[in-house]
Amino acid sequence: MRRERGQQMIYTLTFSPSVDYIVEVDHFRVGEINRTAAEKVVPGGKGLNVSMVLSNLGHESVALGFLAGFTGREIEKRLRESGCRTDFIHVREGFSRINLKMISNGETAINGQGPKITPGDIAKLEKKLERLQAGDILVISGSIPNTLPEDMYERILAAAADRPEGRPDIRLDGRGIRAVVDAEGHLLTNALKYHPFLIKPNQEELEGIFGVHLEKQEEVIPYAEMLQREGARNVLVSMGERGAVLVTETGKVLCAGAPGIRVVNTVGAGDSMVAGFLAGYLESDGDYESAFLTGLAAGSASAASTELAARQEMEALRKRIRVHMGSV
């Protein structure tokens, strides 16, 4: 991770990356031999998706996390082939997950368990995170495997390890590092006190946090604003075919409907929105409307394809999106 002092970098953190084996089966039948109509193998994990889409959009990032065994080596190989930089911790015991994703009259997933991650492995990750500089962006997303502490998000966001200068307990936001959190339930709500730069719940996750049912964008806005009052600087809520809502730290509420697309695959669409938001934010020198547009377009481009969003498709969809100011 060598670079010049002051050079900004995006880091993505995936605790349990996977090899995703995606198969299409016509009329799947339980207890019988089924033949695949199509199949592919791709690196899996929310943070990895963000890194791959950033690469597709022309932005560099460094993928962090834990890998193990032959599957871990395959994940890293494929990421590098897609243009991503990597700086993983390779753990000794076990192998990285193999997840089966089957498409047959709907989507079915069978996810593996992943390797054993030791306290020593965690210490190595924390050491890597100490090297982050002011202006960097750290994307933390996805679930926590059972071999990691339940408060792993908070440990990272609090950056509690002693700094080389001898200053303990320096938080990421206090160091000028912008954290992006894309997680569910208490993982998300417990992160708010660390003032993440961006959080991205989807509509279903927002409903789960507050125990409500939401349908319209104007119904989403007050709950997004509650999360902002709890500490998030910017709140981006994805709503599938209903579009998205962004509550910004500048006091604006932006809404947009999704461009008319035929949804092919929803896996990775939310991660693509995060990547697009960051790409748009950096390309516009911090303009939130531009970030919002690019995020929604990238998410839609992934949903309309069996592949993650590419630049050309994203830009075509971006031209079809209209942003308006939201109100309750």
Language-model-detected regions and their locations in the chain:
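Glycine-rich phosphate/adenosyl-contacting loop at the front of the ribokinase-like
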Residues: 1-64, 70-74, 328
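Short beta-strands and strand-loop turn motifs
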Residues: 109-111, 136-142, 182, 200-205
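Short, small-residue-enriched loops and turns at beta-alpha junctions
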Residues: 115-118, 144-148, 187-189, 243-244, ...
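Charged helix-capping and loop-helix junction motifs
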Residues: 123-126, 150-157, 215-221, 256-259
